[in-house]
């Protein structure tokens, strides 16, 4: 323990945790995700296959897959249960005021998370590039079963609509994903 971290601990502050840099797709039902599915998605999303001579690879051990590509290392978790455990459902619903967001939280039965493993705590420009790659990969898995996309770092949940894939494939996905195609419908509206 460093002197600074010891002083912070003695003052009663917990050390700052690195934010979870992740893209989470919520699905209506569990989905199979084979090694070939991940391989094809990487090729479509990033324009080329992994190159062994560059020490790039994809390793799948369902429900987990690892992708090392260029300078990033990702973990994909394909889970056949809700992202939010039942005991936290009510609390999660309070975090999202919009009815379509609540629907995603309530109705999804499975999720696919794409988590950045390396680089750790990247500076802003590197993080933006990592998000671009992660979002482009996520777009390859968006289908009619996908209810929405969640970003744990920003706590933003975007319900799936006709523009989600375009937002994920854009050069500024974190900005574009917050631009919804339709007016928001709030649960707080009174009739």
Question: How would you describe each model-predicted region?
Answer:
Residues 1-43:
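N-terminal alpha-helical "arm" segments
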Residues 19-21, 104-124, 191:
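Glycine-rich, often proline-containing surface loops adjacent to acidic residues and nearby aromatics
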Residues 29-103:
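N-terminal low-complexity, intrinsically disordered segments
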Residues 34-38, 125-126, 159-168:
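A short acidic (Asp/Glu
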Residues 90-95, 126-138:
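Well-ordered, non-membrane alpha-helical segments in soluble/globular domains
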Residues 113, 148-153:
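A structural signal for short, well-ordered beta-strand segments and their strand-loop junctions
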Residues 139-149:
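Secondary-structure boundary elements
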Residues 152-191:
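Aromatic/basic-lined ligand-recognition segments
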């Amino acid at each position: 323990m460093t002197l600074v971290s010891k002083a912070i601990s003695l003052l009663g502050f917990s050390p700052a945790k690195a934010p979870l840099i992740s893209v989470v797709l919520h699905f209506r039902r569990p989905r199979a995700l084979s090694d070939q599915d991940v391989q094809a998605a990487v090729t479509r999303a990033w324009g080329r296959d992994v190159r062994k001579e560059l020490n790039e690879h994809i390793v799948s051990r369902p429900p987990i897959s690892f992708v090392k590509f260029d300078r990033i290392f990702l973990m994909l978790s394909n889970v056949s249960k809700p992202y939010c455990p039942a005991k936290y459902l009510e609390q999660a619903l309070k975090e999202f005021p919009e009815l379509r967001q609540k629907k995603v939280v309530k109705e999804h039965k499975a999720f696919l998370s794409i988590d950045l493993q390396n680089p750790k705590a990247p500076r802003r420009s590197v993080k933006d590039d990592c998000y671009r790659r992660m979002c482009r990969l996520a777009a390859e898995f968006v289908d009619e079963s996908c209810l929405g996309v969640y970003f744990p770092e920003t706590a933003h949940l975007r319900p799936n609509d006709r523009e989600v894939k375009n937002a994920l494939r854009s050069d500024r996905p974190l900005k574009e994903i917050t631009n919804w195609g339709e007016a928001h419908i709030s649960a707080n509206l009174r009739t």
